[in-house]
C-alpha cells in the first residue's frame, strides 16, 4: 500500500500589475495641485513610499514639491479641521456627601 504524494501546487490566480500612480506625462511640480494632493493624507502629512507605490526618485520629487508648495502657502502645513465635535459636557452635581464612619 503505497501512498501517492501529489506535488504542492500554488493556485494560479491572475496577477494584475497595478498602474503606476504617476504617468509618463505627469510633471511633478509644486504648482500641480491635483497631482500633489493625491500623496497627502487627510491630516496633511506626506504619505510614505510603500503606500504611494512610487519609485525612490518619484517620492523624492513629490516630497520636494509638497515642501515648496507649503512654503509658498499653496498647501497648509497641517490640516487641523476637527472631524469630531465635542459632545455636551456632563455637569456634575454638587451636593452634600455623607461619610461612612
UniProtKB/Swiss-Prot annotation:
GO cellular component: a single term: mitochondrial small ribosomal subunit
One Gene Ontology biological process: translation
InterPro entries linked to this entry: Ribosomal_bS18, Ribosomal_bS18_CS, Ribosomal_bS18_sf
Molecular function terms, GO-annotated: small ribosomal subunit rRNA binding; structural constituent of ribosome
Primary location class: plastid
SUPFAM superfamilies for the chain: Ribosomal protein S18
Subcellular location per the Swiss-Prot or TrEMBL entry: Plastid, Chloroplast
UniProt-listed Pfam families: Ribosomal_S18
Record keywords: Chloroplast, Plastid, Ribonucleoprotein, Ribosomal protein, RNA-binding, rRNA-binding
PANTHER family (UniProt xref): 30S RIBOSOMAL PROTEIN S18 (PTHR13479), SMALL RIBOSOMAL SUBUNIT PROTEIN BS18M (PTHR13479:SF40)
NCBIfam families xref list: S18
Record family assignment: Belongs to the bacterial ribosomal protein bS18 family.
Quaternary structure and interacting proteins, as annotated: Part of the 30S ribosomal subunit.
Protein name: Small ribosomal subunit protein bS18c
Organism from which the protein derives: Nymphaea alba
Gene symbol of the encoding locus: rps18
Amino acid at each position: 500500500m503505497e501512498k501517492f504524494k501529489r506535488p504542492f501546487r500554488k493556485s494560479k490566480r491572475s496577477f494584475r500589475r497595478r498602474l503606476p500612480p504617476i504617468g509618463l506625462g505627469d510633471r511633478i511640480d509644486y504648482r500641480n495641485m491635483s497631482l500633489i494632493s493625491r500623496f497627502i493624507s487627510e491630516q496633511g502629512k506626506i504619505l510614505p513610499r510603500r503606500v504611494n507605490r512610487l519609485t525612490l526618485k518619484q517620492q523624492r520629487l513629490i516630497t520636494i514639491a509638497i515642501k515648496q508648495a507649503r512654503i509658498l502657502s499653496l498647501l497648509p502645513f497641517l490640516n487641523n479641521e476637527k472631524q469630531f465635535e465635542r459632545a455636551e459636557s456632563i455637569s456634575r452635581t454638587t451636593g452634600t456627601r455623607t461619610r461612612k464612619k
